[in-house]
Amino acid sequence: MFVARKISPNCKPGVRGKHTLPKLPYDYAALEPIICREIMELHHQKHHQTYVNNLNAAEEQLEEAKSKSDTTKLIQLAPALRFNGGGHINHTIFWQNLSPNKTQPSDDLKKAIESQWKSLEEFKKELTTLTVAVQGSGWGWLGFNKKSGKLQLAALPNQDPLEASTGLIPLFGIDVWEHAYYLQYKNVRPSYVEAIWDIANWDDISCRFQEAKKLGC
């Protein structure tokens, strides 16, 4: 049901595998001093794992409700599927969007950014401002608009998944739930968002951009 799950090409139609917590492509301490080890462990092992567990539970209930043609239950499950499914999708992208290694946008992505925001720094400033301004918990996103063929920024509340909510293909997401930064940055969200650019994985973001363009009109 959700893109975060890897499905074997040999799987039979209708056979649902359980979602699992993805392994990080780096050590928990690898993103220090930008994000400390304690935050990474809690964020990955506790918060993301909870989304995975709750998504699996909701999907099991969904299958049962479908088998019983229980329309009321199907409707009741929609918020849990959106919240936990979104949490799983968003975090799976988030881990890959970060890297302890210094990277740069591909020439193609840099050109696209500069054509819309004049410079990479202006783009960073606009996404930072948008993300910091999220009320409560949520995410700031760089996405790709398949219809226009252009990059687009968006801010979404809670764990709302970008593509399901807006149609934009997610390229880079910034998590501004307090569990992502509070132990280290306290209530100074701007400092966290500004610092995260130092660990942005432009290799991953650039790759997502290339793949997204293939889906455009």
From Swiss-Prot:
A GO biological-process term: regulation of synaptic plasticity
Location relative to the cell: Mitochondrion matrix
The gene coding this protein: Sod2
Cofactor descriptive note: Binds 1 Mn(2+) ion per subunit.
GO terms, molecular function: antioxidant activity; manganese ion binding; superoxide dismutase activity
Species per Swiss-Prot/TrEMBL record: Drosophila melanogaster
Main location: mitochondrion
PROSITE patterns listed in its UniProt record: SOD_MN
SUPFAM superfamilies: Fe,Mn superoxide dismutase (SOD), C-terminal domain (SSF54719), Fe,Mn superoxide dismutase (SOD), N-terminal domain (SSF46609)
Annotated protein name in UniProt: Superoxide dismutase [Mn], mitochondrial
Self-association and partners: Homotetramer.
